[in-house]
């Protein structure tokens, strides 16, 4: 294809691979409290408290802290009937003293009775297919007979059907949450420790829900290694397409760790799938306070262009042409403007590449000469000011345009 030909091609005619706009996979809408999950809604951010649910006061406070900083859905662990009943009091206190925060109950080992109780108090129940009907693995086993497989499937249906029916009756949601590290022994024998085994674990439960005409379902396929997680979600989307299902996906890299590496792992896994159009809600899992997960989640969503909830800063890496201490100035600009939302602000070290590279920014701060800063609105240079007045002059420019709000 020649350069002349490419000039006449509309971006809509190009493959999705070359589009600069993410085209989300079309999924059905599932309501979790007042938050919608699905392609008709923004990608939702969620997290999980690490308090013992029996500590009602601490759990209520932890949920509120997360919600106040932007966590839209909060999960809590429910390992027993006592915990399930405690959730009812937690929800009551939230509604009475704060807001009705969308809550998800995490139910694992042989959790039918727990799920039936906690479904009264939460907006969504999460079950793990690998642990739902659980028995300790037999190290001497070499295979599963057809009769054993049939018996296990029947037990799953008998235990799962009451949960589906109660969620359906209450118009609540279900997450079928597969973890790579906890596949059922039967699945490991049949498919190995593979993404395909994860997909089949989920699809078994999806088909049961479909047979009961229950469709308030969200699906997750989490693994601690991004390549496994990526393969599992892609396979899951393909499997659903093949069988005519369009349930939303909850993305996450489980056990991502802490610090920079934990954030990088989560970003690689979650961000990659989002750019492919997969994912309707996300959770960044860090071995840190849950509150630290929320800014990372919103940063991922903003980076890929799906939600804009903060200032987008554009700044060059600095070089020998830089006319001021770029790192120091970026920090000052951020301190002065980080409370704003929806703006793009560029800080560039010199005029060689600065104006061109910041062309899409709302405002620009560019080194013009020794001790001189040029301020831009879009592509237009507005004024030159001494360097020591640059940040305050930028703030005044934003104010004059009516785009400033006080912190």
UniProtKB/Swiss-Prot annotation:
User: What reaction does this enzyme carry out catalytically?
Assistant: (2E)-4-hydroxy-3-methylbut-2-enyl diphosphate + 2 oxidized [2Fe-2S]-[ferredoxin] + H2O = 2-C-methyl-D-erythritol 2,4-cyclic diphosphate + 2 reduced [2Fe-2S]-[ferredoxin] + H(+)
Has keyword 4Fe-4S? Answer: yes
Q: Which cofactors does the annotated protein need, by name?
A: [4Fe-4S] cluster
Q: What is its EC number?
A: 1.17.7.1
Give the family, as the similarity comment puts it: Belongs to the IspG family.
Q: In which pathway does it act?
A: Isoprenoid biosynthesis; isopentenyl diphosphate biosynthesis via DXP pathway; isopentenyl diphosphate from 1-deoxy-D-xylulose 5-phosphate: step 5/6
| Molecular-function GO term, any one | iron ion binding
Query: What functional role does this protein have?
Result: Converts 2C-methyl-D-erythritol 2,4-cyclodiphosphate (ME-2,4cPP) into 1-hydroxy-2-methyl-2-(E)-butenyl 4-diphosphate.
SUPFAM superfamilies assigned: Nitrite and sulphite reductase 4Fe-4S domain-like
Question: What UniProt keywords are attached to this protein's entry?
Answer: 4Fe-4S, Iron, Iron-sulfur, Isoprene biosynthesis, Metal-binding, Oxidoreductase
Per UniProt, the cofactor note for this protein states: Binds 1 [4Fe-4S] cluster.
User: What is the main EC category here?
Assistant: oxidoreductase
- Ligand binding ([4Fe-4S] cluster): 316, 319, 350, 357
Q: Name one GO biological process term.
A: isopentenyl diphosphate biosynthetic process, methylerythritol 4-phosphate pathway
Please identify the protein, giving its name as recorded: 4-hydroxy-3-methylbut-2-en-1-yl diphosphate synthase (ferredoxin)
